[in-house]
């Protein structure tokens, strides 16, 4: 298999930037979820020193705005999965199993296990019970049988995450991925009901409400690994009303760094975890030598 030219990914990002600046998209900046955008930019910029040249850039299929209803009626929490809940499973680019739900919004799972009661910020964060990664909007999104979610509204807002570190981590990745890849009407619902937006972050949220899905409408072909299962997760700060969650994705570089991480702030408001939309200039990404120890654990 031929080795892909890393400059192609940089070129795609440059073309998108040029299009946004010329008015091809609404607004002067088009903000994706920080969960994915930081990793996209970091990996595209750093890809020139990668050594793994055989990863596919084929994009998983995406659902469009016409695939889902737009009202906010929640799913009823399930006690038993329907027989046709899932189609044929797939894998991400690293071979991790990903289920294919027949519901394009994702399939909530029966909550059959008590949530974790671990709240030590320095403790290793084990995955929730019954963790399942599902392909939703072409991305990989986590569900569990212990820490939620317990419902998803028909306009794509997940709820019912446990008031635990695992619940915060599940909510962070769920909300971030949905805000990145979902149709724009669902982006708006997520930001209205599952996010906290400061005055400084409002321009970023406005762009995401109206432009989120448009960046991929032209099929720019960003690397497929942007939709992968995170290689490791950790929580560095946790209290009853706040959690700082970090996710890592792998890199192969000549200087010893093996991954790039991004941090996400979550707050507990109104009985649910909500994503704190980052303000402009906030860059919580960093390079990692290892995702072994130091609180990191694979999920």
Task: Please state what every model-predicted region is.
Residues 1-27:
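Terminal targeting segments of Actinobacterial cell-envelope proteins
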Residues 31-45:
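Hydrophobic membrane-insertion alpha-helices, especially the h-region
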